[in-house]
């Protein structure tokens, strides 16, 4: 290691590089902070509207969704798709709690996608298998450009009539998250797996429909700001990564 040659630009160039990176980093931090504040706003509103969840009737998750299924993993390229070409989601598409369809891997031309495993608007996707820190993470698909599959390490569910997807998705990602993660089997150092049969029996508090509707309307308004903030984060992160690649690769 001591004999390794390291490229070291001149002092003026080092300062120029530092200025560019220092310009991007605060903007990235601010956008992430804005996203956190919006998430806190939703959490506060949820508690304000629903209060103690134990006051509501509880149903098994399998009685709250019309289906609970795993996806399909196919041989993929190392890069994301172009346009609406067929692709498979990466786990990073849902691990933040916000559905990010750009996190995908393109399918090769000679691999045929499976139509029954395509993501649809209104789906709730939940990480069935992942590291202990990320297993159980979930996100609601508010919009999809189509032609994109979910992998076999993800559960897909769709709420039954009478249950708002926004409400159920929020429950799974927040108040019930620790209960979901507690279902996972596996050691602290290995990939953890949530059995379908155990997830199906998870107790879900069902609030009155009018409250669910009001909460869904509130989240819809906040989501407009969350979408803008997430777009800004993605753009700034791409810029930062490209600068780092240019200067340090």
Question: What do the predicted segments below correspond to?
Answer:
Residues 1-12, 80, 147-153, 185-213:
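A short glycine-rich beta-alpha junction/loop motif
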Residues 1, 90, 115-173, 195:
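A short beta-sheet element
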Residues 3-18, 26-72, 201, 206-214, ...:
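Non-catalytic DNA-recognition/assembly elements of restriction-modification systems
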Residues 62-78, 92-124:
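Sequence-specific dsDNA recognition surfaces
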Residues 29, 112-113, 188, 227:
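Short, solvent-exposed loop/turn positions at domain surfaces
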Residues 20, 164-171, 211-214, 218:
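Short amphipathic alpha-helical coupling segments at ligand-binding clamshell hinges
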Residues 57, 74-81, 183-185:
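Short coil/turn segments at secondary-structure boundaries
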């Amino acid at each position: 290691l001591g004999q390794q040659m390291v490229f070291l630009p001149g002092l003026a160039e080092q300062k120029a590089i530092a200025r560019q990176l220092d310009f991007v980093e605060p903007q990235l931090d601010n956008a992430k902070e804005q996203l956190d504040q919006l998430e806190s706003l939703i959490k506060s509103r949820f508690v304000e509207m629903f209060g103690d969840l134990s006051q509501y009737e509880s149903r098994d998750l399998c009685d709250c969704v019309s289906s609970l299924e795993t996806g399909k993993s196919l041989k993929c390229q190392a890069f994301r798709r172009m346009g609406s070409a067929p692709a498979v989601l990466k786990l990073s598409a849902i691990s933040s709690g916000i559905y990010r369809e750009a996190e995908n891997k393109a399918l090769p031309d000679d691999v045929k996608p499976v139509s029954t495993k395509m993501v649809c608007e209104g789906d709730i996707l939940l990480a069935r298998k992942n590291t202990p820190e990320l297993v159980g993470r979930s996100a609601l698909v508010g919009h999809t450009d189509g032609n994109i599959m979910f992998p076999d390490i993800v559960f897909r569910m769709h709420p039954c009539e009478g249950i708002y997807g926004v409400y159920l998705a929020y429950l799974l990602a927040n108040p019930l998250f620790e209960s979901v993660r507690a279902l996972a089997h596996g050691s602290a150092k290995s990939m953890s797996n949530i059995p379908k049969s155990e997830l199906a029996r998870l107790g879900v508090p069902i609030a009155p429909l009018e409250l669910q509707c009001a909460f869904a309307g509130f989240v819809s308004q906040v989501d407009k700001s969350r979408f803008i903030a997430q777009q800004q984060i993605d753009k700034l992160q791409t810029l930062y990564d490209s600068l780092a690649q240019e200067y340090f690769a």
